Structure formats: C-alpha cells, structure tokens
Curated annotation (Swiss-Prot):
Disulfide bonds: none annotated. It is an enzyme of class 5 (isomerase). The modification N6-(pyridoxal phosphate)lysine is found at residue 40. Catalyzes the interconversion of L-alanine and D-alanine. May also act on other amino acids. Its EC number is 5.1.1.1. The gene is alr. Keywords: Isomerase, Pyridoxal phosphate. This is Alanine racemase. PROSITE patterns: ALANINE_RACEMASE.
Length: 366
C-alpha cells in the first residue's frame, strides 16, 4: 500500500528512545558481549532503515528475517554484519555472498541441496541454527552439527556462529527454558569444532536470564520499549515505548437515541450523543475487534462504537470537538496513556503483533 501522507493518521517513532533502550539493556548484560539489533519485519513496524542507522554506533550487527530485508539495509548503506534468521534456499546464495549477508543453515538437507545448486561457498558466512526445543528449524544432535560444519567448511564457507531460540524465556515458569538451555549447552560442549560466536539470548533472555548469556545477544522488542512478556513479568529497568499512533477527527455529529452506527448496525445509541469519525481502519492494522476499546481525545478515553471499517472508525465523544482535534490511539494525551500492550491485552494477542500489523499506509514520522 502507498503511504497516505495527505490524511492526519501517522505513527511517530522516537529514535532516541530506541537508542536509550538498547543502551539500558547493554548496561545489564556482561561486558564484551556482541549486540545484534533485530530489525526484521521493518523493525517491528518502526522502520528498519531508520532504526538501523540510528543504532549504527551501538551495535555489532543486525538480524533480519529474509534476504530482501538484508538487501534493503545494504542498499541504504548499512555495512555491518547482517544475519538472516530464517532459511535462505541455496539458489539465492550468489546474492547473499555478493552482498556479504550472513545466512542461517538449519539442516543437512540444505547442505546437500547447496552441493547440487551452489557448491562453491567461498565468501559465505554462516550461523548454524540448533532446535533446542522451539520446534521450528534447526539441527538436534552433535553428530549432525559436526557433519554440517565439516561439510560447509569443505565447500569454502566460514562457519562463524551457532545459535538457538527459547520458546518460553518470557514466562514465569522456567522449566521449558532450562530444558532448552541445558540441551544447547550440552550440544555446544560436545562439538569437535565450535564456532566463534554462540548466541541464544533474545530480548527476554537478555533481561530476565542475563546469567545465561553466551557471547552475543539479539535485541528485538525491548529495543522498541516493550515488555516481551506483555504484562506477565516486571521489567528489571524502565523502557521507553518508541512508537505512538495518532490521528484527528474528520467528522463530528450528534446522533439520537435509536440511531445505529457502522456495518451490521452493531451499535445503537441509548440517548443523544456526539460521534466522531477518525480516518484509520483495519486496512491500517487497526483491527475490527477493536470495537469497545477506547482512544484518547482531549485527555479523555473515548469508546470506539460500531465496527471498525476498512478506512475509518467512530468514537463516542463527551462533547462536540472541532475538526482536526487530535486523537491518540497509542501513546500519551494530557497525562493519560494507551500502550501497545493495552491494545494487545484487549485483542488477546501480543504487543509484537499489534506493531507488526500497522500497515505501511500509515506514514512513519521520525
């Protein structure tokens, strides 16, 4: 979708807050540990290029989801290491080697395919993924990893790192976390040829399990000022939420008792009341199930009434406000605040998803 600069709906991204959040985590982890900024999914909706440039002096590299995200950073002039966390099939390796993008290898099947499709891996930097219990991608045994490392090196690749990902690092019950940690430690200890970089710490592990950090961390959601657990665990230090979302009233009217609002006529006024229309809808990532939630106008919580439409939503107002009056959907308005986690709790989802669903139709202002 094209970014809509000619309407009042915008996301404001505080890059200084992101820099300070990363600095706060770095103070909390052991000295000498490398920091990778996770900027996949357009930096969780904050803008991958802008965030990466802002963090350039603070981090050692970046993590993305796929090759296209890596190339976007290279084209923007980012010259530090970029690690693709997902699997890149061997038919795309030429571009990864040319643009000096580090790839994740997660199986011996990948190695066999590479031997057929791109046997010369000279110039390719690799991190090996271990499935310690997440159940998505990765190898599960010392023998497999030893064979993979030997095979990759014989084809000319540099095996720089090895890593895993925890499924429950953001939960109070650490049983599964400890099982995964012990599995990973045992596997690493059994390797004949251990890669230089070992990393297992995502945002949650970095802040709640800092004693388990190896020699690199991957900082994602905490960089953007959000609690990885939502509301389940307390943060050990304060973070600044970096993104706010705002719009304006574009239509205000009074309706009478018995009048309905929105598709399906799901809202019926019980008395005369003022209704405001705001130009944001589910095409922007403000999902239909937000009916009944509130936004902030003039420091007051105003309920979303009627179904959220593709491009608009309607709110109940305490009085008639002029067109152009500010509407806050995420962030502060006259000492009142709506957080991304508040929205996630209402939707019965996670704060990550709320941010990632904000579409590129909403301009990001820095």
């Amino acid at each position: 979708m094209i970014s809509s600069f000619h309407r009042p709906t915008v996301a404001r991204v505080n890059l200084q807050a992101i820099k300070e959040n990363v600095a706060s985590v770095q103070k909390h982890i052991p000295l000498g540990v490398k920091t990778y900024a996770v900027v996949k999914a357009d930096a969780y909706g904050h803008g991958a290029v802008q965030v990466s440039k802002a963090l350039l002096p603070q981090v050692d590299g970046y993590c993305v989801s796929n090759l296209d995200e890596a190339l976007q950073l290279r084209q923007a002039g980012i010259d530090k290491e970029i690690l693709i966390l997902g699997v890149l099939l061997p038919n795309e390796l030429k571009l990864a080697i040319t643009r000096q993008v580090t790839v994740t290898v997660a199986s011996l099947e990948w190695l066999a395919m590479a031997k057929q499709e791109w046997p010369d891996l000279k110039g390719l930097k690799v991190h090996i993924k271990i499935d310690s219990g997440m159940g998505r991608i990765g190898l599960r045994s010392v023998t497999e990893v030893d064979n993979l490392i030997a095979g990759l090196k014989s084809m000319g690749a540099e095996v720089e790192g090895i890593f895993t990902h925890f499924a429950t690092a953001d939960e109070a019950d650490d049983t599964k976390f400890n099982q995964q940690l012990q599995f990973f430690k045992k596997l690493i200890a059994g390797l004949e040829d251990k890669p230089r970089l070992v990393h297992a710490s995502n945002s949650a592990t970095s802040i709640w399990h800092s004693d388990t950090i190896f020699n690199a961390v991957r900082l994602g959601i905490v960089s953007y000022g959000l609690n990885p657990s939502g509301s389940d665990l307390s943060l050990p230090f304060p973070l600044q939420e970096a993104l706010s979302l705002e719009s304006s009233l574009v239509h205000v009217k009074m309706i009478s008792a018995g009048d309905t609002v929105g598709y399906g006529a799901t809202y019926t006024a019980k008395k005369s009341e003022y209704v405001g229309t705001v130009p944001i809808g589910y095409a922007d990532g403000w999902t239909r199930n937000m009916q009944g939630f509130s936004v902030l106008v003039d420091g007051q919580f105003c309920e979303i009434i009627g179904r959220v439409s593709m491009d608009q939503l309607t709110i109940r107002l305490p009085k008639a406000y002029p067109l152009g009056t500010k509407v806050t959907l995420i962030g502060s308005n006259q000492q009142k605040n709506i957080s991304t986690t508040d929205i996630a709790n209402y939707r019965n989802t996670i704060n990550y998803e709320v941010l990632c669903l904000l579409s590129d139709r909403i301009p990001r202002i820095y």
